[in-house]
Amino acid sequence: TGLPIYNKFVDKLEAYMAAHGKSGLFFVSSDFSNFQYVNEMYGYEVGDRILHDFAIALQEKCQNGVLFCRVTSDHFVGVLKEDTVEKARDKYLEFTNTFVQKTNSRYDQCNLVIATGMYEILENDWSVSSMMDNANEARKQCKTQKVDSAVEIYTEKFRKNLENTREIVSGMVAAYNNKEFRAYLQPKVSLHTGKVVGAEALVR
């Protein structure tokens, strides 16, 4: 695609932050909602062409002092530099909307939608993977609530939800290691005969 691989992107971002600081930096995570539909409707060759075109569009943005890379097939991450999070959101949304409109006019059954999560990088942030986790969390929320291309900004609410999820997962691992889980079989009874016809397995 011409974009750097993720590891190279991380190296460049860490070097940039060390040299220039983190003020005005916003981490973005974008993917295409229901992209499998595009592949099924037009074929993988067209799908790959759309992703390649998006990568080229991102490369052009990279000339303005921002960084981007392709993480997986239709998942791209990068860093923007703007005065405020509102400006970063509005400019990036304008960019994705322009790309979507151009692509949808070319492939009229495409109905392309780009979901983006955005996280404002703070002075005490150094872990790029954590920045991406935060942007991903906002992106997932964007995909569940929006039917058009949109940019969801990571907030304190997302942080609390992410911490709660991590605590639950950590607690589940500890409970499994301590053999605290118990398996139960909940009977399924036929409404016609009143007899047990099966069971549902539950773990608590």
Kindly label every feature range from the protein language model.
Residues 1-26, 33-60, 69-73, 77-78, ...:
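Conserved long alpha-helical elements within nucleotide-processing catalytic cores of c-di-GMP signaling
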